[in-house]
Amino acid sequence: MDDDDDDIPQLSSHTLAALQEFYLEQQQREGMKTSQGFNQYSVGSIEEDWQLSQFWYSDETASCLANEAIVAAGKGGRIACVSAPSVYQKLREQGGADFSVCILEYDRRFSVYGEEFIFYDYNNPLNLPEHLLPHSFDIVVADPPYLSEECLQKTAETIKYLTKGKILLCTGAIMEEQAAKHLGVKICKFIPKHSRNLANEFRCYVNYASGLD
């Protein structure tokens, strides 16, 4: 038997360091869950699944978007988070009885949030439960999972069905023209950040006078 290990693929030192950092972060999060009591609504309580193109917002960005949604919805308003689970989590973490919120999401891990979770596949944009009536939400916050016009166009069908008018869209800067085309939204000065740096520049878009400029 040949004992030569030359043919075994070796990870680079940079990749090994990144993996070690990732596993250390996981261990630290698990430790926090057990030692401090687990907050199921904290951003990151459900791990990102990169295969589903999941990248959570930073805590600061999630708070900013949640607060914007609350103000835009108004007292007693209804907020829909479409493929934007970290905004939903921040809304629920902050609490408050002056609004209601639901999460439309493909990832069934978020079903832990009970009746507020609605399974959603952008490929079937209008395949929604009967109780989700058209134009029944004061604002829709959406973050389409992929930077493609097809994904944006289909998600836009859902957004336009749900919203009474107000839209807060988060997607790549490269989607500015398509966002205006399909949803009539304009880019904001506010720049959203993610907990892990992404290669693509992200921006927010709205169709109303927001606090993000």
From Swiss-Prot:
What keywords would UniProt list here?
Answer: Cytoplasm, Methyltransferase, Transferase
The entry lists its GO molecular-function terms as: methyltransferase activity; nucleic acid binding; protein-lysine N-methyltransferase activity
Give the UniProt entry's GO cellular component terms: cytoplasm
Which cell locations does it reside in? Cytoplasm
The record, for Pfam families, names: N6-adenineMlase
Q: Which InterPro entries match?
A: DNA_methylase_N6_adenine_CS (IPR002052), Efm5/EEF1AKMT1 (IPR019369), Mlase_EEF1AKMT1/ZCCHC4 (IPR041370), SAM-dependent_MTases_sf (IPR029063)
Q: Could you say which enzyme class this protein belongs to?
A: transferase
Question: Is Methyltransferase one of the keywords?
Answer: yes
Q: Which terms under GO biological process does the entry name? A: peptidyl-lysine methylation
Q: Transmembrane segments in this chain: where? A: none
Reaction catalysed? L-lysyl-[protein] + 3 S-adenosyl-L-methionine = N(6),N(6),N(6)-trimethyl-L-lysyl-[protein] + 3 S-adenosyl-L-homocysteine + 3 H(+)
State the EC number(s). 2.1.1.-
Reported function: Protein-lysine methyltransferase that selectively catalyzes the trimethylation of EEF1A at 'Lys-79'.
Family listed: Belongs to the class I-like SAM-binding methyltransferase superfamily. EFM5 family.
Query: What is the designated name of this protein?
Result: EEF1A lysine methyltransferase 1
Taxonomic source organism: Gallus gallus (Chicken)
